[in-house]
Amino acid sequence: HGAEVTVFPHGDLAALQAMLVEASGQRCLVVTDGVFSMDGTLAPLPELTELCRRFGAALMVDDAHGLGTVGATGRGIVEHFGMQQDPPDVLVVTGSKALGAEGGAVLASESVIAMLRQRARPYVYSTAPSPAVCAALTAALDILNGPNSPVPDLHRNVDRMATRLGLDTWPTPIVPVAVGDEASAVQAAHELGEQGWFVPAMRWPTVPRSRAIL
């Protein structure tokens, strides 16, 4: 039998708790992004972890947009919240965002990794990364962990941009500018492009209708 998938509203911990109460006695896996790619906000990892521990659910976090950008040294949402000693049960990261390469990794217990190696079709039926890709990822991680890490400069640039735009200081490099009207967002993106700025307009179905952003 396949798993039953239930979606809880974005950031609504009360709704998630109600779902976990209803599913009491069943095996549950809570899945969330670490950094939400459209608005740059962070998942409330400490609260999610506490809820999952209380109800015996496992927690999986996709930190694709966190690795290399979030946390003092770019180690992602776990570092941002200081939860290195209590990480999610499954942490997924990618090499195709901040690291500028390809591939990804699943960080979990030995038993979970063993199960994935045997049963996860995307792993079983995928070709391994090429040596060149592996070398690029290794080099990117070395830079991230080295004395000349670009992460502090990234954080300063994000703060500077947010301040100049009149926005609150932002925890991630994804800084959304609300426009609302889709045509206006597309026009603004076009005009920015003519001035040499690549600022995509995000509109439905990527974001809800009439809530377009840059």
Residues covered by each model-derived region:
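Active-site C-terminal subdomain of aminotransferase-like
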Residues: 21, 55-58, 65, 70-171
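Active-site phosphate-binding strand-loop segment of PLP-dependent enzymes
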Residues: 5-61
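Short, small-residue-enriched loops and turns at beta-alpha junctions
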Residues: 13-14, 35-39, 66-69, 123-124, ...
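A short linear hydrophobic-aromatic micro-motif
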Residues: 92, 124, 198-204
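Pyridoxal 5′-phosphate
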Residues: 1, 9, 13, 31-34, ...
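Conserved PLP-binding catalytic core of the aspartate aminotransferase-like
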Residues: 152-196, 205-206, 210-214
